[in-house]
Amino acid sequence: LKKISGLRKMPALSFDKVKGAEPIALVKGGEDDGKVLYIHKDDYKGSKPKRSEIHAKEYTTELRSLKPAERVQLINRLQEARDKGLAADQLVGETALGKSLYERILADDAKDTSINLPDDSQFQIVPSPDPKKREVFYIAGASGSGKSYIAKGIAELYRKLHPSRQVYLISKLEEDSTLDTMSPPPKRISIQSLIDDFPDLEEFQDCCVIFDDYDTFTGDAEKVVHKLIDDLATMGRHTNTTMLCLSHYLTNYKKTRLLLNEATHIVVYPMATSFHALSYLMKTHIGMSRDDCRDLKKMGRWVCVYKHYPQWLCSLHHA
């Protein structure tokens, strides 16, 4: 969980569905497959995945008196003890150094608000189950980065959470190998129909609209698609319209300013994005520092940031 400046209390993450908790991601694969990750507006302490392995480099000061082989043996013993859920006073036969280090490790675990999944599992972003809450996902990345895959996952979960609602697709492409394989497939809206008869916003009451690579439209198509995006972004809360806007650009001056201001979630692909573009977006719209943005580069293929309180950050294996 990434700490964003301005928060007085650090919100907590857990698998516990308690009052006030909001779902943010679903675990796919591994031991925790099917579990939902919730965010709490306080420092709630709840169930989490098993901690990942202990990294000796984080405790070099405590380990410096030991030989390399002894360090490995000690870390392995403490790893086994932590996996069993043992307290420090339950370490029978352990050295004083080992017990002291183990207490430090457990203290670090208690303070850590982040969650890391093993390689055999991953997070999938979850839309809100609240029928009265609409969301705006801004998903930006180069061609082939996986924007359609992320959008498909969100839209399919939206349909499961709200089975009576429709998912619409507005795209320049007549066919999409990812989005069109949703089950059931999204209902396509032709660009020409928007040009010929611009729709009233009430026609998008209680639904989800996917705008696929909307920045590639030109001419009249560009005008009507951008107008519809702007109208739904600013007034879609009245029609309860969730939006998934896929773009090649992280920022594009006036064309993206309004949408980015209204977005509830921003999904980016740090490893395939220039540091300048990434840091500008995250500093301007999230409040991240340059060091925060450098950390994003280490978090995997994609990163999703929730802009509103309580703010959170989630990637493929980390939250």
Regions found by a protein language model. Name each.
Residues 16-125:
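N-terminal pre-Walker A segment at the start of P-loop NTPase domains
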Residues 1-2:
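Histidine-centered divalent-metal-coordination microenvironment in nucleic-acid enzymes
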Residues 83, 96-100, 110-114, 118-122, ...:
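Conformational switch/transducer regions in large eukaryotic molecular machines and scaffolds
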Residues 134-157, 172-176, 189-290:
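Conserved P-loop NTPase motor cores
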Residues 289-319:
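Conserved AAA+ ATPase small/helical "lid" subdomain
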Residues 124-134:
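Phosphate-binding P-loop
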Residues 177-187:
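Short, aromatic/basic amphipathic alpha-helical patches
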Residues 156-167:
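Post-Walker A helix-loop "phosphate-sensing" segment adjacent to the P-loop in P-loop NTPases
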